[in-house]
Amino acid sequence: MKKKYTIRKKIFGFLEKPRVSIFRSNKHIYAQVIDDYKGNTLISASSKKLLKFYKKRREKKITKKELSYKIGNLLGKIIKSYGISKILFDRNGYIYHGRVKALAKGLRNVGLQF
């Protein structure tokens, strides 16, 4: 917890350059685009919502890492549609590896800079 607060003091997102915060559980990954100036969550995406879509279409099983990449890609497209090109990436104290790295790669492939 102390690590989170230390990181949060240094990172402050605003409307032109919002903060993308990640929460990772054992099963799912969640990402939120936050405007810290107003304290609002602008956009959110999660693997929970995307998995429902895949189950309805009865496609092949997808790994958590692939799902994280798709979440990043989807969130990136939505952010780009709002006209935002730069973001602050808040990995929330998680190591930049695996699912966190895949989500960041998905955001970067859309053209976002951080």
From Swiss-Prot:
Print the keywords alphabetically: Ribonucleoprotein, Ribosomal protein, RNA-binding, rRNA-binding
Q: Which SUPFAM superfamilies match?
A: Translational machinery components
Q: Single GO cellular component annotation? A: ribosome
Q: Which GO terms describe its biological process?
A: translation
* Molecular function terms from GO: 5S rRNA binding; structural constituent of ribosome
CDD domains per the UniProt record, alphabetical: Ribosomal_L18_L5e
User: Which InterPro entries is this protein grouped with?
Assistant: Ribosomal_uL18_bac-type, Ribosomal_uL18_bac/euk
- Provide the family line: Belongs to the universal ribosomal protein uL18 family.
Subunit info here reads: Part of the 50S ribosomal subunit; part of the 5S rRNA/L5/L18/L25 subcomplex. Contacts the 5S and 23S rRNAs.
Q: What does this protein do?
A: This is one of the proteins that bind and probably mediate the attachment of the 5S RNA into the large ribosomal subunit, where it forms part of the central protuberance.
HAMAP family in UniProt: Ribosomal_uL18_B
Q: What is this protein called?
A: Large ribosomal subunit protein uL18
Species of origin reads Aster yellows phytoplasma
Gene that codes for this? rplR
